[in-house]
């Protein structure tokens, strides 16, 4: 089964105290209306798993989606940033919720940062990269809506973004289109690698914690 296929909605939370216990999470983040929810739907091969709106700022909570292929693994749709047409109190709550989640969530193992390919590397995108870099975890950038550009424009944008982020070794980048189903396999390969890395680290920790059977028994030496 493909990694994301048949993912299901699990829960939505508005406060960190309500976050569910999970083994591993991959979070989707980006500017409002960059295409986060559309990306989740395309990857899961579902049309209405994550709510898609033409109005920016509709994702106001943290939404969890459980992977059918790995029951303890989750996709997380975070509130979009950069949308000004909401009350200041609401925007302040989003900022606190998003920031504290990214800083403190122990089960978060990687970030999928969605940027509109026609308008990448906005100031808030760069702030997000700098903020998350402190965790030392990988970020994979999806240059969404790339189908709105011709091939020459796509290649130029991809090269420009790669050059601009050369100083971010934990970042990888690709073109992506939810509507045309382009780039899905590449995203799946990247995220599967993150999960495999987590499982390898967990296996190493278990091995390190086991007693060494080769250690001689002091009583047998007498």
Curated annotation (Swiss-Prot):
UniProt-listed Pfam families: MMR_HSR1 (PF01926)
Gene3D superfamilies in UniProt: P-loop containing nucleotide triphosphate hydrolases
Domain of life: Bacteria
Comp. bias intervals (Basic and acidic residues): 212-222
CDD domains associated with the record: YihA_EngB
UniProt-recorded Gene Ontology molecular function terms: GTP binding; metal ion binding
Binding site for Mg(2+): 37, 59
Keywords in alphabetical order: Cell cycle, Cell division, GTP-binding, Magnesium, Metal-binding, Nucleotide-binding, Septation
Cofactor(s) needed by this chain: Mg(2+)
Region (Disordered): 201-222
GO cellular component: cytosol
EngB-type G domain segment(s): 22-197
GO BP term, pick one: division septum assembly
Keyword S-adenosyl-L-methionine belongs to the record: no
InterPro entries referenced in this protein's UniProt entry, alphabetically: G_ENGB_dom, GTP-bd, GTP-bd_ribosome_bio_YsxC, P-loop_NTPase
Similarity field: Belongs to the TRAFAC class TrmE-Era-EngA-EngB-Septin-like GTPase superfamily. EngB GTPase family.
Biological function: Necessary for normal cell division and for the maintenance of normal septation.
PANTHER family: ENGB-TYPE G DOMAIN-CONTAINING PROTEIN, MSS1/TRME-RELATED GTP-BINDING PROTEIN
NCBIfam families from the UniProt entry: GTPase_YsxC (TIGR03598)
Record-given protein name: Probable GTP-binding protein EngB
Provenance organism: Laribacter hongkongensis (strain HLHK9)
Organism lineage: Bacteria, Pseudomonadati, Pseudomonadota, Betaproteobacteria, Neisseriales
């Amino acid at each position: 089964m493909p990694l994301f296929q048949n993912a299901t909605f699990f829960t939505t939370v508005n406060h960190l105290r309500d976050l569910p216990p999970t083994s591993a999470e991959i979070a989707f983040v980006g500017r409002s209306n960059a295409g986060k929810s559309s990306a989740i739907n395309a990857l899961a091969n579902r049309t209405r798993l994550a709510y898609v709106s033409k109005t920016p700022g509709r994702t106001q909570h943290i939404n969890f989606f459980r992977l059918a292929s790995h029951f303890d693994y989750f996709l997380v749709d975070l509130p979009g940033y950069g949308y000004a047409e909401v009350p200041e109190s609401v925007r302040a709550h989003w900022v606190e919720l998003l920031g504290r989640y990214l800083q403190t969530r122990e089960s978060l193992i990687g970030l999928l940062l969605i940027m509109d390919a026609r308008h990448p590397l906005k100031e808030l995108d760069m702030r997000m990269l700098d903020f998350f870099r402190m965790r030392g975890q990988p970020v994979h950038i999806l240059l969404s809506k790339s189908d709105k550009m011709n091939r020459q424009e796509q290649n130029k944008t991809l090269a420009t973004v790669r050059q601009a982020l050369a100083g971010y070794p934990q970042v990888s980048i690709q073109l992506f289109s939810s509507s045309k189903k382009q780039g899905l396999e590449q995203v799946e390969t990247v995220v599967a690698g993150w999960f495999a890395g987590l499982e390898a680290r967990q296996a190493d920790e278990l091995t390190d914690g086991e007693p060494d059977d080769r250690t001689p028994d002091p009583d047998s030496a007498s």
